[in-house]
């Protein structure tokens, strides 16, 4: 979708296996809307959601909890449970959703940019999408008072961190034991 690609700076690459990095957007909202209207005049496509359809301020606690479950089931394997992004196979990555607008999160669900699957309205309804977005807003607005936020980095980094600490500790202990044993003889 034109609005998502121009609005996020994640323009598709010439080779589909390459990961498109997010770039600073160079277009105003008006320019993006004009290009989107032109492309829509050529062929039908997903509509840009209205701000009212993405309003999450009136969601109840149960709906936010349901949004958390939907996100956990459909999104967290790639984006992390907090929406901070994560590693994918073959050097690709799922971007962080921390600073992504509600509109662009919704558009990404509907259009499936790059390696992301498309979530049609029969899979994730508009209400489901609002609940997921509401969950992300709630998660991102809560302060992290836990010190070193390793849990928000992602599974690959956490595993690497654990591997380095674990193996590094074993190597240090083995070296210490080897030197201690050599002196005892």
Identify the role of each PLM range.
Residues 1-12, 42-49, 62, 68, ...:
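Periplasmic/extracellular electron-transfer cofactor-ligation site
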Residues 30-33, 37, 65-76, 95, ...:
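Solvent-exposed, polar/charged alpha-helical surfaces in well-ordered, non-transmembrane soluble domains
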Residues 84-89, 93, 103-104, 111-113, ...:
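Extracytoplasmic/periplasmic C-terminal soluble domains
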């Amino acid at each position: 979708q034109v609005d998502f690609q121009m609005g996020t700076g994640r323009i598709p690459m010439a080779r589909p296996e390459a990961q498109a990095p997010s770039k600073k957007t160079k277009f105003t909202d008006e320019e993006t809307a004009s290009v989107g209207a032109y492309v829509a005049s050529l062929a039908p496509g997903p509509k840009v959601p209205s701000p009212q359809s993405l309003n999450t301020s009136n969601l109840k606690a149960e709906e936010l909890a349901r949004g958390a479950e939907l996100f956990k089931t459909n999104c967290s394997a790639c984006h992390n449970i907090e929406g901070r992004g994560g590693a994918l196979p073959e050097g690709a990555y799922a971007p962080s959703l921390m600073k992504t607008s509600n509109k662009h999160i919704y558009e990404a669900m509907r259009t499936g940019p790059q390696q992301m699957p498309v979530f049609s309205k029969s899979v994730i309804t508009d209400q489901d999408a609002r609940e997921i977005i509401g969950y992300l807003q709630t998660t991102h607005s809560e302060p992290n008072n836990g010190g070193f936020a390793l849990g928000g980095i992602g599974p690959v980094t956490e595993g690497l961190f654990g591997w380095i600490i674990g193996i590094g500790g074993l190597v240090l202990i083995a070296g210490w034991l080897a030197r201690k044993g050599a002196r005892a003889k």
